[in-house]
Amino acid sequence: MKKIRPLTEADVTAESAFFMQRRQVLKALGISAAALSLPSTAQADLFSWFKGNDRPKAPAGKPLEFSQPAAWRSDLALTPEDKVTGYNNFYEFGLDKADPAANAGSLKTEPWTLKISGEVAKPFTLDYDDLTHRFPLEERIYRMRCVEAWSMVVPWIGFPLYKLLAQAQPTSHAKYVAFETLYAPDDMPGQKDRFIGGGLKYPYVEGLRLDEAMHPLTLMTVGVYGKALPPQNGAPIRLIVPWKYGFKGIKSIVSIKLTRERPPTTWNLSAPNEYGFYANVNPHVDHPRWSQATERFIGSGGILDVQRQPTLLFNGYANEVASLYRGLNLRENF
């Protein structure tokens, strides 16, 4: 894998700068192109980090048993655990990046049922214990790229989705895989209150082509940093597709259904001109409101310590996945 250059310490801004208007401050930091086009909630998150506001501490999950295959090791600089668990998009618990860690404690993950159905010869159901014991777990260090033009490097723990699908035995009619998040308005306040949940239609749904789902990089994820996923990161099981934007990584999954037709996906339903079905990371295809050519890597420091870096096609996984899209116009099929 290509190396990401190490982050460097940035000079501390004078105290007087904190009294500038938010947009002036963000422009002074050189992040106007993307950040000033983001929703006000995302801008507020950036400004909170700029001021050094503390992020909530996530409860520790139980330790998991897993292997560390050499193929998935990396010398990329990891994003610190407190950033991975404290800076999240999970609108079911609020719009601010700190809201999931603050509010997701209400999510009940035991018992849990994950149903695999649709165009399969052998539909089946997994319970909570199956999620961490039915398939061997392995740690994979992946880049994670948000559509909002920020990125992390995360040591996820899980198993390849293809192993689960192989047990279900897809029929010849299966062309897509549809995913659905838990619908529990009493536990997920954003599902009950449109103001809290960003006006999205719930439950959250996502989808992949079958060949994307069967790719070895596609991971059903149950842990991070050696422990079970905390609720704010999508406990007890979520999807990670490292060459796609983060909103494809549906969280707290209760249903996987193989289908003949392309399934609807939440953000595409909400704003089809901004969020496509494929959502492949592509520096040459901008979001209508900001550039995707560069990204902010979230490392050990606050926003003053972050430097922009070039966005990599397919998030740096082009050698592994570009063949999936041979002949497909990536600008039209964004």
UniProtKB/Swiss-Prot annotation:
Gene3D superfamilies: Oxidoreductase, molybdopterin-binding domain. One of its GO terms (molecular function) is molybdopterin cofactor binding. Keywords: Metal-binding, Molybdenum, Oxidoreductase, Periplasm, Signal. Part of the MsrPQ system that repairs oxidized periplasmic proteins containing methionine sulfoxide residues (Met-O), using respiratory chain electrons. Thus protects these proteins from oxidative-stress damage caused by reactive species of oxygen and chlorine generated by the host defense mechanisms. MsrPQ is essential for the maintenance of envelope integrity under bleach stress, rescuing a wide series of structurally unrelated periplasmic proteins from methionine oxidation, including the primary periplasmic chaperone SurA and the lipoprotein Pal. Mo-molybdopterin binds at residues 88, 91-92, 146, 181, 233, 238, 249-251. The gene is msrP. InterPro entries: MsrP, OxRdtase_Mopterin-bd_dom, OxRdtase_Mopterin-bd_sf, TAT_signal. Residues 1-44 form the signal peptide. Binds 1 Mo-molybdopterin (Mo-MPT) cofactor per subunit. It comes from Salmonella typhimurium (strain LT2 / SGSC1412 / ATCC 700720). Heterodimer of a catalytic subunit (MsrP) and a heme-binding subunit (MsrQ). This is Protein-methionine-sulfoxide reductase catalytic subunit MsrP. One of its GO terms (cellular component) is periplasmic space. Predicted to be exported by the Tat system. The position of the signal peptide cleavage has not been experimentally proven. PROSITE patterns: TAT. It is found in: Periplasm.
